[in-house]
């Protein structure tokens, strides 16, 4: 089986309306992207992840899939007419059926964190069988080890865990940091996330990796203190959660923060210096890891 894929040029102001009209006209799927995607003219949607900026791209490209037997020109004309638009410029190509699962899997290779720590998709043979291999597949929750912030936290765990620590992963996403901590020798690990889906994904991933960790929503987490607290989230929540995160760290314990852009490092370090002796920041691809040691409460 094959499909016809139409690429349609559109002004961004009407792209969503035209995409909806294409679906009404018989398209199987539509997607809207920057007309300059993949070029030096591409415009970012986000600055800090999760914070939209005012500027959005001005020219869009609508990628539309049709049945192989469809009269693409007629359907595009009908959609444009429904939107009271002139016939847009477009191109059509034939897309052959593929093994989409295999194609998707081929895009995710094992990730080396260090000589002894790897992240390996479940369908892939471990490249270093004697290393600590975290089995983790791309899914609905953030955290596969490919992002610099996750990598920075994993590198810290790999180098700094001595064994038998209690660990809290605040904003656990996929559970990757809690799972890694256990496989690297931590005695216990707890993960907290505001998303129930992330809590479920973390539980599934822990089972996949043969470790026992507890994952909770914030209001269900028992009050406790830990030897190590990790929070790989974003700068804004880290600004607001300082007192809470500090309360979970034992005196002499360690805090590890990421999800921080390089230009935000000084501000966040100053905030957390209220409770911690802060270490110099570590940078990776424009992102920052901050760490510190908990002082005794006054």
UniProtKB/Swiss-Prot annotation:
Molecular function as annotated in GO: protein-lysine N-methyltransferase activity
InterPro entries xref list: Ribosomal_L11_MeTrfase_PrmA, Ribosomal_PrmA_MeTrfase, SAM-dependent_MTases_sf
Enzyme class of the recorded protein, top EC level: transferase
EC number annotated for this UniProt entry: 2.1.1.-
Top-rank taxon: Bacteria
UniProt cross-references to CDD domains, sorted A to Z: AdoMet_MTases
GO biological process: methylation
Binding site for S-adenosyl-L-methionine: 150, 171, 193, 232
Catalysed reactions, semicolon-separated: L-lysyl-[protein] + 3 S-adenosyl-L-methionine = N(6),N(6),N(6)-trimethyl-L-lysyl-[protein] + 3 S-adenosyl-L-homocysteine + 3 H(+)
Cellular compartment(s): Cytoplasm
Location (main, coarse): cytoplasm
GO CC entries: cytosol
Protein keywords: Cytoplasm, Methyltransferase, S-adenosyl-L-methionine, Transferase
Cross-referenced Pfam families: PrmA
Gene3D superfamilies listed in its UniProt record: Vaccinia Virus protein VP39 (3.40.50.150)
Similarity comment: family membership: Belongs to the methyltransferase superfamily. PrmA family.
Biological role stated in the UniProt entry: Methylates ribosomal protein L11.
Protein's recorded name: Ribosomal protein L11 methyltransferase
Species assigned in the record: Chromobacterium violaceum (strain ATCC 12472 / DSM 30191 / JCM 1249 / CCUG 213 / NBRC 12614 / NCIMB 9131 / NCTC 9757 / MK)
